[in-house]
Amino acid sequence: FTDISGASLEVMKIKFKDYLTSSIRFIKCNMESLPFEKDEFDIIFCAGGLSYGNNFQVLNEIYRVLKNKGVFIVIDSLNENPIYKINRYLHFIKGNRTKSTLKRMPNFRLLKKYKYKFGSTLIIFSGALIWILHPLSKFIGYSNSRKISDLFDNLLPNWMSFKFVIVAKKVK
């Protein structure tokens, strides 16, 4: 596991102490300059971290340390839907986000760069109506509201999505 925050790594050690083995390492590092050899990893997973580094540097570092035929999986927020942009801006005004993070939030342009770099790339979009899921679940139950949300994810344009998942395979 890597993180730029030593405190975050300590929290992970505590939360997952029952699952740790000697092969699991915790390394404090910057994702823009990973301290690993070229072609070192078969799989890299990133959850919500793309907006915390220079997009171009992060893309190149992930590609560099991933083995040929290795897989990069990321889940993150998409910064295209105006509702979510306003929400993120309100968090910025409250001091919960930095301006640089807002500028680096993943968008379609960044997703195209990943697709171009990796070649073999699957992108799944979801959460177009996530903002209504909780209130709706109070009336029709979580399972039914989730079905409606999934249906709209398939019907609505991708720019309305809240989240995306990339599954990219490195092919030299």
Language-model-derived ranges and their functions:
Residues 87, 91, 122-172:
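A C-terminal cap/extension of S-adenosyl-L-methionine-dependent methyltransferases
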